[in-house]
Regions:
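NAD(P)-binding Rossmann-fold cofactor-contacting core
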Residues: 150-174
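N-terminal Rossmann-fold NAD(P) dinucleotide-binding loop
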Residues: 141-142
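Short helix-loop-beta connector
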Residues: 124-131, 153, 212-213
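Conserved beta-strand elements of the Class I
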Residues: 132-133, 290
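Glycine-rich Rossmann-fold phosphate-binding loop(s) that bind the pyrophosphate
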Residues: 137-138
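N-terminal ligand-binding/catalytic initiation module
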Residues: 1-110, 118, 128, 302, ...
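Adenosine-phosphate binding glycine-rich loop
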Residues: 228-316
Length: 316
């Protein structure tokens, strides 16, 4: 193989290789590197297609310790039968300027999204938390369950989704046999200490003001413009954390709306993962709800692509 030709890893191969690496630990190192100035995370780049045909988002990142940089590009293509979303990551060498890896990033995106949430839950949740709730049932929700199920001594793990078919139910119970799949959202949220929102919804799926006690609520991104899983005005009543304070407020839908319409300011963010993992910011008090928002960082994609590259390189 020419030194100028990158390895190409398809979705099935990526899935297999991901089982061989400790994704949360790779991400913890990444955020500590970011805090120490050994990594660079530019803002996401959103480019809209003409005539409302969709868009694509570029996620960039530089890992100086590993001497690599790269980009994940993910299109959102509008179609009559529903939108099409794909993602590919290109890993480049900072030493030779040559491409190292081209990887179908679908599996990587799912893994890093869920593992980032798990890292946040571990950093933000009280050690005595007992009840975990998950909203959603697709591959991202399944990955969240996989990475979060062992973080605390959960006495109850419940999941709500309006779309749990027999196949999803079997997959979820294979991941965690103790899982309770409930028919009503309020049954999952009741007395929950941690609530993981794992949907592709562009509009709120829960109202934190309706919860009976303070909880950690985590939320992820989808490609829809200004997508948000909680009401934007709720940010004013929560302790807000995010994956990276320099980029998240400029992309997260509820933060953009809260800033423009509800008097919220990004300066109210209590901390990000780089600060939490380097102990530059304290853990929350839980006098009120805690909200963790991730948009997904290019650095996460690059770090996992780099780990897969080294696994593949070693095997070959």
């Amino acid at each position: 193989m020419s030194g100028h030709t990158p390895y190409v890893i398809d979705s099935q191969q990526a899935h297999r290789l991901l089982q061989q690496i400790d994704v949360p630990q790779i991400l913890r190192k990444l955020f500590r590197d970011l805090a120490a100035g050994q990594a660079v995370q530019p803002a996401q780049q959103l480019v809209e297609f003409p005539q409302g045909a969709g868009d694509f988002i570029n996620y960039l990142g530089v890992l100086a310790d590993d001497q690599v940089y790269g980009v994940k590009t993910s299109p959102y293509i509008v179609r009559e039968q529903g939108p099409l979303v794909t993602a590919w990551t290109l890993l480049m060498s900072m030493q030779t300027g040559q491409p190292l890896l081209l990887c179908d990033a679908g599996e990587l995106t799912t893994a890093r999204t869920a593992a980032t949430t798990a890292v946040a839950v571990d950093a933000l949740t009280p050690l005595d938390a007992k009840r975990l709730a998950i909203v959603g049932s697709g591959p991202v929700a399944q990955a969240h369950l996989h990475y979060a199920r062992g973080l605390r001594d959960w006495q109850d793990i419940s999941l709500y989704s309006p779309n749990v078919n027999a196949d999803k139910r079997a997959r979820l119970n294979d991941i965690e046999p103790r899982l309770r799949i409930v028919e009503h959202l309020e049954h999952a949220l009741e007395d929950a200490d941690v609530i993981l929102l794992c949907t592709s919804s562009a509009t709120p799926v829960i109202d934190p003001s309706q919860l009976r006690k303070p909880a950690l609520i985590t939320s992820i991104s989808t490609n829809a413009v200004r997508a948000h899983e909680v009401p934007p005005q709720a940010l004013n009543d929560m302790q807000v954390y995010c994956d990276y304070r320099k980029t998240t407020p400029g992309s997260a839908g509820e933060m953009l709306i809260a800033a423009s319409q509800h008097g919220w300011d990004a300066g109210q963010i209590h901390g990000d993962l780089a600060e939490l993992l380097s102990e530059q910011t304290p853990r929350p008090t839980y006098a009120r709800h805690v909200f963790f928002r991730s948009i997904g960082l290019g650095l996460e994609d690059i770090a996992l692509a780099n780990a897969l590259y080294h696994l593949h390189h070693k095997a070959s």
